[in-house]
């Protein structure tokens, strides 16, 4: 009995040093930030083995899969998030980006339209939808989406994107105006969409 009692503190200490699902998520975030995408995927997968209901783990792993060009795996992870939380707007935009990367622009547009119905003032949705509309040669819709972004959070990359649409439409004066605004205005160069995550 004394042996069991003596071993108990060691067992307890060993249990407290085992990484949790949250710790694996943090490790994955660190690995990805440091440019080690493969290790990030491994950490997120370990987090999900410990807690298969951890939607943040699926979303994070899906983002890394997307970065790696593993679009089918990314799509599966984003769909898993949406299965459990159909109101997760960021998962819709990530899923739509995956569809667009696979060349499925019509379905990407449908997903983004659904997301905009859930959160009509989310800049990332308009920016993504503008790009999809551009790829579908729906230039008026692309201009409308990019203008919505500019009205909410002006950034040089959005002016450049809208300028590219105007060029395709043959509206070179408007295109030049947007390109010049992107160069000279005191606005951020890029949208910081990650600071807008819900």
Where are these regions (language model features)?
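Terminal, low-structured helical/coil segments at or just beyond the last alpha-helical repeat
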Residues: 15, 164-198
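Alpha-helical segment of the N-proximal tetratricopeptide repeat
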Residues: 20-50, 63, 67
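Canonical tetratricopeptide repeat
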Residues: 26, 60, 67, 94, ...
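Structural signature of tandem alpha-helical TPR/SEL1-like repeats
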Residues: 34-43, 68-80, 101-114, 136-148, ...
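Structural marker of alpha-solenoid helical repeat scaffolds
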Residues: 50, 84, 118, 151-152, ...
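Residue-level recognition of tetratricopeptide repeat
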Residues: 54, 88, 122, 155-156, ...
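TPR alpha-solenoid repeat register
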Residues: 57, 91, 125, 158-159, ...
């Amino acid at each position: 009995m004394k042996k069991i009692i003596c071993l108990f503190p060691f067992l307890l200490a060993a249990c407290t040093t085992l990484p949790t699902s949250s710790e694996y998520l943090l490790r994955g975030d660190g690995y990805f930030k440091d440019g080690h995408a493969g290790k990030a995927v491994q950490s997120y997968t370990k987090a999900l083995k410990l807690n298969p209901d951890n939607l943040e783990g699926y979303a994070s792993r899906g983002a890394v899969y997307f970065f790696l060009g593993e679009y089918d795996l990314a799509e599966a992870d984003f769909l898993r998030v949406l299965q459990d939380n159909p109101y997760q707007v960021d998962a819709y935009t990530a899923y739509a980006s995956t569809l667009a990367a696979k060349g499925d622009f019509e379905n990407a547009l449908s997903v983004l339209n659904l997301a905009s119905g859930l959160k009509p003032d989310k800049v990332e949705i308009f920016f993504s939808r503008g790009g999809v509309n551009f790829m579908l040669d729906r230039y008026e819709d692309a201009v409308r989406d990019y203008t919505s972004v500019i009205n909410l959070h002006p950034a040089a990359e959005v002016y450049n994107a809208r300028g590219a649409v105007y060029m395709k439409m043959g509206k070179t004066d408007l295109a030049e105006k947007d390109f010049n605004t992107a160069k000279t205005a005191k606005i951020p160069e890029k949208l910081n969409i990650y600071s807008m995550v819900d």
